[in-house]
Regions:
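Short, charged surface segments at domain edges that flank catalytic/cofactor-binding sites
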Residues: 2-12, 16, 22-70, 94-96
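Single-residue recognition of alpha-helix capping/boundary positions
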Residues: 11, 109, 128-131
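The −1 position to Zn-ligating cysteines in a subset of zinc-ribbon hairpins
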Residues: 67, 82, 105
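Histidine-centered nuclease catalytic patch
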Residues: 72-102
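Short Cys/His-centered divalent metal-binding micro-motifs
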Residues: 73-76, 102-124
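Short Fe-S-cluster ligation motifs
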Residues: 97-113, 133-140
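Charged phosphate-binding loop/patch that engages nucleotide di/tri-phosphates or the phosphate backbone
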Residues: 120-140
Length: 140
């Protein structure tokens, strides 16, 4: 059975009140219409500038497990550097503030993800490839 797609602000607010977060943790189980997702992301994070990025990184660090998604080590002193975009902000600014477009990574694996030569060897690569296909499909 296909998941119910959240199309309205009321449905989004209802999910939040019930303890779900279709913007982040529950995004794949409770998908949102892309126009609504963009609108809410803009409201929460603002523009794709330094202030907006700071809000976005803080949100991700508050809503995602603070464990490297590649090696499983705990992120003891979380910072914006631990929030690694799957699709780069520069090449895909429309996805820069989509929490589905990030991994939480330790510094070593953040650097590895950014290098095409080491990216293919990473455990998160197959999952990220599926995410890339889904995000590109939704944002086109």
């Amino acid at each position: 059975m296909k998941p119910v797609v959240i199309h309205t602000r009321e449905d989004f607010e209802s999910a939040i009140k019930r303890g779900f977060n279709p913007l982040c943790e529950d995004a794949w189980r409770l998908p949102m219409a892309i126009d609504l997702r963009r609108e809410i992301q803009r409201e929460i994070f603002g523009k794709n500038d330094a202030a907006g990025n700071q809000k976005f990184y803080k949100y991700c660090l508050e809503h995602k497990p603070l464990v490297c998604e590649e090696c499983g080590c705990p992120i003891n002193h979380p910072s914006a550097y631990n929030v690694s975009h799957i699709l780069t902000r520069g090449a895909h600014p429309e996805m820069a503030h989509d929490p589905r477009n990030v991994n939480i990574l330790c510094p070593k694996h953040h650097s590895s993800w950014e290098q095409a030569t080491t990216r293919r060897e990473m455990l998160i690569e197959p999952k990220n490839e599926r995410i890339i296909r889904q995000l590109k499909k939704e944002y086109q």
